[in-house]
Amino acid sequence: MKKKVVAMFLAAVMALSLVACGSKSDNGGSGDASGTETIKLGGVGPLTGGYANYGLSVQHGAELAVKEINAAGGVNGKQLELSFQDSQGDPESAVAAYGKLMDWGMNVSLGAVLSGETASVVAAAKADDVLVMETTGSADKCIDGNDKAFRICFYDSYQGTAAADYLTDNALATEVGVFYQSDNDYSVGLYNAFVAECQNTGVTIKETQTFTTATSTDFSTQVNALASSGVKVVFIPIYAEDASTFLTQAKGKFADDVYFFGADGLDGILGKVSQDVTIADNVLMMTPFAADSADPKVQAFVKAYQDAYNATPDQFAADAYDAVYAVKAAVEAANGSTSGADLAAVMPTITVEGVTGTMTWSADGNTNKAASAILYKNGVGTLFGQDNANDAAGAESGDAADTAADAEA
């Protein structure tokens, strides 16, 4: 009898261990939520430190989308859960945060925020059956090597090329200056693409100035060189933190009609110059998102965001918001599966009508959508329209006429 009891006990233990092993394999890094009640989304980004404005925007945009989707019934009947971890902008911390999210049971990753940390997270995710729906990591190669990684934002070489084309399409200038960070992948990537396209369009780079992380407090030499060059546009493919320093030191040194032209890294510039928002006057920023757009989807998003966070959403918030809706569309297209392989297979087949535009994806993970530009004046950013372009074209024509008159005299 005693042996029989022991045998029954051992059989029960073996059965329990088999169940436990089965549960672990169902959830341990597979990304598949088919047997769970919720779909877990995880994000990583700087919530503290100098780049916290970007991370908080991404977190808030994603949170808002999750709340809306859950209130509308979820995705295939399942509610979404979101966990967003602080990376402090450090790639190693970002990978550690990604591991923490995998231990939590994350099904889909929203990637990271900055390009450097994104590359590290995407590489770490390669071995897991998890879709990475990258929100804002824009360096060309930061999603390379992982065929389950897709992104919402523009990639850097696209932004640099689009910026150069925008100059000629809107007759902004035929000669430009450039100020970029030579030890930053984001800045260098945009710079290289911009210069290459300027060569194709006939725009002359008249003056180029650089800085590094170690020299990011005093830009007086660069400001003076660019101001004395007489260019009407200075291309600044840098982040808002450094842009605020540059613009503060540049105030009063340039003519009133000079544009400071940048890409998505400038988003949040007004918050960096809140002591005097006119420092950002004539900043022109390439973006797929404009908070003052008449699009009903954008208006609804802006109102909901303002109600929730008492702030106007920037492009980073909009990208994250669209990323969550893209996850929803992919899960629905994959018949409810959250397997990374299944979601990656359907990504090139879906279309998402987002607040950053109509999006489709190529097999390489990059998105296809249109870009526009925002012009800042007196602390307000508005879509840069034809009236602005006509003013710029008129200024160019006037300069040419003045030059011709001087030559005749």
Model-derived regions: residue spans:
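Short, low-complexity disordered leader/linker segments with a strong preference
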Residues: M1-K40, A71, N388-A409
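Beta-alpha junction/loop-to-helix N-cap segments that form part of ligand/metal-binding clefts
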Residues: D26-D32, Y54-H60, A72-I143, F211-T217, ...
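Extracytoplasmic "Venus flytrap"
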Residues: G35, I39-E63, Q85-P91, V113-L114, ...
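Periplasmic-binding protein-like
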Residues: L101-V113, V132-T135, G177-Y180, G230-A240, ...
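An alpha-beta-alpha
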Residues: A149-T210, V233
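Extracellular/periplasmic bilobed ligand-binding domains
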Residues: A193-M286
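Extracellular/periplasmic periplasmic-binding protein-like sensory domains
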Residues: A250-Y321, G381, D387
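Segments of small-molecule ligand-sensing domains
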Residues: D307-A317, K328-V380
